[in-house]
């Protein structure tokens, strides 16, 4: 399909699919200076992992793009704190990557060297963060048992090759894919793998009640392999460098709008393309694009400006998610040589903690700074807790641990040096929705109304596999329709 931008504008205004909150007159080019009208092959909304990768990939393939990001930076969950005293970077959120071709090619493109990432530090201390008292884990499998359990897990995972291309499931969906993961664990005797699965992937809510397919979406064969053989990470231990370099390149080609937000959208099928009104620090911009690629979490409150169809509203309205938060704390009085994990004696066979709560505290690359992760259970709310409520709970948790263990930890006044909310995290749906074909219906949206979709909801919370999904599936679909 080859469409001029002049005909694109005419087609859109003639379309019967209009935005209820913004009549077509709002999109009249006469309301915009020529410098404020941006014409591109593809408009990408959301500058996180998948959106940034897709914009760069499309650009490399000769397509004109405009990437629109609400925040003042790219990277999404990839956040890096630079210690002002030493210049040492400390990554939060996204830490490591799989040793696969798409990862190595992407970092090489921006001249960022990789090597084997540091192993995750094993906890030597377990406390019930509700009380501050020490907990003794009752289930401590040996390495051989863990390996055998992961092998049994992979034997079941491998029955569903469609998982490489998203969440492509058999029809009808087998009951095994929507049963609670805890029942699946018992059925296949993979208990020894569960502590690793839980602590490697915080932010999923109640792992044992999650439907099996929601666990499969993150714990891919690539993830299991990386846990066994090692992950990759930037040599300079600064994941955000990837995004600052992508940001510089996109700015240079006038392909990026930061601190910007779509306020109205006009989408239609056929040759009509899409029109967007974007609020930017420099005023309103009118975007005329042949295709739209949405790469942020598809929650209804975030999608309000995008003129959703009844089908889109129905599907996206089914999502639940978890709150997930990260931060760095100084003056914690916690050790610099081991991590501390949350546990609750007698709660599940694995002494998993009650949520919402901090998962763990771990030493960072800067002595005296502790990396903390915190999460909630599943919720329909996109932003389940305020940042201030989470930070207050974390500080109170540290003080409880100090008070109950004066022989181990010094009493201090902890302070945050940085904090970030990654909510809504790990979008998923309930068992009955999976049974009723939610994912099959979801993927039929790709390409409708000149709109494509990528991001964790379409694959999983894993940057390496999001890049693979975007490169192998989504970007080719977008280009085919241009």
UniProtKB/Swiss-Prot annotation:
One of its GO terms (biological process) is terpenoid biosynthetic process. Glycans are attached at residues 99, 165, 238, 337. One of its GO terms (molecular function) is oxidoreductase activity. Its EC number is 1.21.-.-. Pfam families: NAD_binding_8. Residues 1-21 form the signal peptide. Its cofactor is FAD. Keywords: FAD, Flavoprotein, Glycoprotein, Oxidoreductase, Signal. Pathway: Secondary metabolite biosynthesis; terpenoid biosynthesis. It comes from the Eukaryota. FAD-dependent oxidoreductase; part of the gene cluster that mediates the biosynthesis of the sesterterpenes ophiobolins, fungal phytotoxins with potential anti-cancer activities. The first step of the pathway is performed by the sesterterpene synthase oblA that possesses both prenyl transferase and terpene cyclase activity, converting isopentenyl diphosphate and dimethylallyl diphosphate into geranylfarnesyl diphosphate (GFPP) and further converting GFPP into ophiobolin F, respectively. Other sesterterpenoids (C(25) terpenoids) are found as minor products of oblA. Belongs to the beta-cyclopiazonate dehydrogenase family. This is FAD-dependent oxidoreductase oblC.
């Amino acid at each position: 399909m080859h469409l001029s931008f002049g005909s694109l504008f005419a087609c859109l205004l003639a379309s019967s699919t209009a935005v209820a909150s913004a009549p077509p007159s709002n999109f009249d080019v006469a309301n915009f200076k020529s410098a404020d009208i941006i014409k591109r092959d593809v408009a990408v909304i959301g500058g996180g992992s998948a959106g940034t990768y897709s914009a760069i990939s499309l650009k490399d393939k000769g397509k004109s793009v405009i990437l629109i990001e609400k925040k003042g930076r790219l990277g999404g969950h990839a956040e890096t704190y630079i210690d002002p005293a030493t210049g040492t970077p400390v990554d939060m959120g996204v830490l490591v990557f799989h040793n696969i071709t798409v990862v190595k090619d992407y970092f090489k493109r921006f001249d960022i060297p990789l090597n084997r990432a540091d192993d995750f530090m094993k906890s030597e201390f377990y406390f019930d963060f509700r009380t501050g008292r020490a907990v003794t884990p009752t289930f401590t499998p040996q390495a051989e048992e863990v390996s055998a359990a992961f092998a049994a897990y992979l034997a079941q995972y491998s029955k569903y090759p469609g998982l490489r291309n998203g969440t492509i499931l058999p029809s009808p969906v087998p009951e095994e894919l929507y049963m609670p993961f805890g029942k699946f664990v018992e059925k296949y005797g993979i208990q020894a793998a569960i502590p690793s699965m839980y602590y490697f992937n915080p932010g999923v809510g109640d792992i044992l009640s999650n439907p099996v397919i929601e666990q499969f979406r993150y714990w891919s064969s690539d993830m299991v392999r990386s846990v066994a053989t090692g992950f990759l990470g930037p040599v300079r231990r600064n994941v955000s460098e990837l995004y600052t370099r992508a940001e510089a390149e996109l700015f240079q080609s006038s392909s990026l709008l930061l601190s910007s937000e779509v306020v109205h959208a006009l989408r239609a099928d056929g040759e009509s393309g899409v029109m967007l009104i974007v609020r930017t620090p420099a005023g309103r911009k009118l975007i005329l694009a042949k295709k739209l690629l949405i790469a942020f979490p598809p929650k209804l409150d975030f999608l309000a400006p995008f003129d959703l169809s009844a089908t889109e509203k129905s599907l996206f309205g089914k999502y639940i998610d978890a709150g997930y938060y990260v931060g760095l704390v100084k003056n914690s009085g916690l050790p610099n040589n081991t991590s501390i994990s949350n546990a609750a004696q007698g709660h599940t066979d694995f002494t998993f903690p009650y949520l919402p709560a901090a998962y763990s505290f771990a030493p960072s690359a800067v002595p005296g700074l502790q990396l903390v992760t915190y999460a909630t259970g599943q919720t329909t709310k996109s932003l389940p807790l305020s940042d201030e409520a989470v930070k207050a709970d974390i500080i109170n948790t540290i003080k409880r641990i100090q008070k109950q263990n004066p022989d181990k930890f010094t009493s201090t006044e902890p302070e945050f040096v940085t904090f970030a909310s990654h909510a809504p995290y790990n979008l998923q749906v309930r068992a009955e929705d999976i049974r009723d074909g939610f994912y099959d219906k979801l993927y039929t949206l790709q390409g409708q109304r000149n709109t494509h979709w990528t991001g964790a909801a379409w694959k999983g919370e894993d940057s390496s596999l999001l890049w693979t999904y975007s490169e192998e599936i989504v970007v080719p679909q977008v280009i085919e329709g241009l």
